[in-house]
């Protein structure tokens, strides 16, 4: 029995390569089968974005914004980066900015978890809190104010094309590669900025025309499902909070406005169905 145990013991061999920087490990996250939640006859997989080095899909957005800004000359060596975030984008930016030597200032409503602030500060970011009564729109305006006042680089995750573009070039291609021998019938995603659904859908709509794309949002904050237009300024940024938004239980999921990045998915009908989910159900299924 001991011999059999050694024979079948799990082992690894390494990746066979060395990395020049932590940012080079972003992406190529695995699709993992979830064996205990799906109905009979259904194979359910998750794209495990927590395998990214700072723990979320926002690492992709962070490296894309910084590197594309460097290429364009919009971000100068040593220049301070500023962004409004509920957490994960700030954590991803803190990692990328630390690796590349940029100071980072994050604006965040004081309603978001203390753990997120601590992690961003641990990674070297300065965190500026805004009143929760001003919601996401308040921290968004504070970031713009600081950028204009100090000549800082505003990451603009809610408007920049660098957001959806990175998902078009990476996330979508990874999904196609992982499912090249397996039929994929549905792609289900929520939204924050809208970068994932917009970038992935650009590719999957073309390559997998029979695939159904399901967009999820909080049941009590159905800003897309309301069909009410988002007021915008001349540059596409939100002019105010969306009237259909209400506070919900999942932090970072669905801001109180429709980002310009998400607007592309709405205008081009990149999704086939909206799936509202209650906060309590979302938490319960995450635990399961």
Regions found by a protein language model. Give the residues of each.
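Fold-independent oxyanion-binding glycine-rich loops
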Residues: 29, 47-49, 65, 85, ...
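Short, small-residue-enriched loops and turns at beta-alpha junctions
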Residues: 52-54, 134-136, 161-165
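Positively charged, low-complexity intrinsically disordered leader regions
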Residues: 5-79
